[in-house]
Amino acid sequence: MDMYKNIRPIVDPNRPKVYIETYGCQMNVNDSEVILSILQDEGYALTDNIEEANIILANTCSIRDNAEQRVWGRIDQFRIQKRKRSGVIIGIVGCMAERLKTKLLEGHEVDLVAGPDAYRSLPQLIRDITPDSPQINVLLSHEETYADISPVRMDKNGISAFISIMRGCNNVCSYCVVPYTRGAERSRDPETIVREAQELYSNGYKEVTLLGQNVDSYFWKDAEDASKNVNFAQLLEKVAKISPELRVRFSTSHPKDISDEVIQTMAIYENICRHIHLPVQSGSSIMLEKMRRKYNREWYLERVAKIRSVLPDCGITTDVIAGFSGETEQDHQDTLTLMEKVVFDSAFMFAYSERPGTLASKKYPDDIPYEEKTRRLNEIIALQGRMSLKSNEKEIGKYLKVLVEGPSKKNPNELCGRASNNKMCVFPSNGEKVGDYCTVKVESVTSATLICSRLQ
């Protein structure tokens, strides 16, 4: 089988069309590329125009309630297409499909429901759909990693791509729905990962991001020879060795699992980007225990100190939840003081959203009033804005190597791209193309951007 026959979407006006909308995490973006690969092999072509689609798919997220509410709103929009054109198929795939299962089929809202481990069955499910017989497959697998399927890349710039190195999660944090929607943790054969990264580099890609719910627990066990087992640090090294011109990123790390070996490997290879996304969720050890995060405040701060001692220029970003069950004002203050201590580059910040079926939904009341959650979240957001600015100000005067991603949104005469530490730089164009590397000098900053000059 030729794994890499079509790395970009096929353009063919004669093929039936599939339209894919993706919600949620980077893993879902990569899953949509796997889905497209499977459907392209069945004779379909991707379209960006919903009006011409024969199949409309939403690849969904369940991490918070508002993510699901958005999809319910979109289903109403999709059904307009169904009324306009007979034979249009509407499918919900991904985590919301896994969580809600047959509820999505009630009232004939959609024709197709497929969970994250059921994408290989999509062609058969589509063939079996009739007006009276919608199709569903939400079986979770202990083996499926889609390792033999080459994703068809849907990115717009042709230089940055995602590679899924594992699926599922074994951590079962009390607030999180992911283990129930994506199943148990499975690591992918490292040789297929390296081959995929090599193929991307051969096709002009300059950056790959290795994806997993918890990349640090990646572990490939060789069935015959234990000396051929591969952990995450070893996998990182294998991908980094493809070429010094290929940047390697990864996400997401877990504070309890990020090892000294991973940090040391990053230090050895310059093309492994100096950025770690390390979700803290709360600065309170009491809350962390209740969340089942399996580390405390001191452990987290020690890991940050270790990263900075080995990689002083490493960007660190995080996730923070405001208003988890039973969170006191002191717990909230603990989060704020931890943020001030670490000075994160940026953060994803959310008010706690109780998810049905999780341990927290069964064990802990969602007892922080909406107004209080909102107040705490707004304090966290305001503080992070100041911390982002403080972090960026340390970059002033530095020279950074940047990968050009495209024109600046605000000024088409300027370019933008990220430095190794994941900070976004804006700088004057000097005729560079997307995918070129260039060195810039940081002259001034905002909380979100480094404004840079060019080296003459």
Model-identified regions with their sequence ranges:
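Proteins enriched for Cys/Gly/acidic motifs involved in redox and nucleic-acid/cofactor modification
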Residues: 1-219, 231, 261, 276, ...
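Short flexible coil/turn linkers enriched for glycine and charged/polar residues
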Residues: 155-159, 169-171, 272, 282, ...
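Terminal RNA-binding accessory module
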Residues: 5, 360-456
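Conserved, mostly hydrophobic/aromatic
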Residues: 173, 193, 210, 250, ...
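Alpha-helix N-cap/loop-to-helix initiation residues
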Residues: 28, 64-67, 97, 255, ...
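Glycine-centered loop/turn positions within well-structured domains
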Residues: 120, 171, 216, 285-286, ...
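Conserved SAM/AdoMet-binding glycine-rich loop
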Residues: 90-94, 202-330, 340
